[in-house]
């Protein structure tokens, strides 16, 4: 579990299968004294999917986010399958001094595969210049794994900024 002791799973809709799959979290070897698996639900059901976003779910659970006593958050989706040591990912982020670190995978078959994924445009220092859909027009691409790490304080401020800019 990459030494991660506190896991929050945000669920927008149809939670039964997620809850059944995760169970109590005991099989993830989470330290029962200092860690926990927390399932967080969206407080409102929006009939319009355009407003049923990760941001709205984070906003509905802002109190839990604000109470976290951890300096960093790792945000990862449920629909990407990959193997990574998140502890190493976090340490690499801290050592880099970057505000946000994105996880990506260099591929050489982006013309035929990963067509539903976003790809990153990187500069020479591997800084992100763009995030855009993979249109299948290049063989070599950096596929964004929809996973990032940043300070908790920055994450909360970005959520609040998104709320102010949005029509939610």
Placement of each model-derived feature along the sequence:
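Acidic metal-phosphate-binding loop of nucleotide-sugar-dependent transferases
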Residues: 79-81
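Conserved donor-nucleotide/metal-binding helix-loop-beta segment in metal-dependent transferases, i.e.
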Residues: 83-116, 122
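Conserved N-terminal catalytic core of the sugar/cofactor nucleotidyltransferase
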Residues: 1-72, 88
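Catalytic-core segments of class I nucleotidyltransferases/pyrophosphorylases
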Residues: 123-168
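Rossmann-like NAD(P)H-binding beta-loop-alpha module
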Residues: 56-60, 65, 69-70, 105-130, ...
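Conserved beta-strand termini and adjacent loop/short-helix elements that scaffold enzyme active sites
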Residues: 40-42, 103, 131
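His/Asp/Glu-rich metal-coordinating catalytic cores
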Residues: 67, 84-87, 137-144
């Amino acid at each position: 579990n990459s030494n991660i002791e506190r896991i929050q799973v945000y669920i927008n809709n149809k939670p039964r299968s997620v809850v059944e799959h995760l169970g109590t979290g005991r099989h993830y070897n989470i330290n029962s004294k200092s860690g926990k698996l927390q399932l967080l639900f969206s407080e409102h059901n929006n009939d319009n999917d355009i407003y049923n976003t990760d941001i709205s779910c984070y906003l509905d659970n802002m109190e839990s986010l604000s109470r976290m006593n951890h300096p960093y958050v790792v945000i990862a989706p449920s629909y990407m399958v990959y193997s990574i040591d998140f502890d190493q990912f976090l340490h690499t982020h801290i050592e880099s001094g970057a505000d946000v670190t994105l996880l990506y995978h260099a591929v050489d078959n982006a013309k035929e595969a990963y067509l539903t994924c976003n790809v990153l445009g990187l500069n020479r220092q591997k800084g992100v210049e763009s995030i855009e859909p993979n249109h299948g027009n290049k063989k070599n691409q950096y596929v964004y794994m929809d996973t990032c790490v940043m300070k908790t304080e920055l994450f909360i401020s970005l959520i609040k900024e998104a709320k102010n800019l949005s029509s939610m």
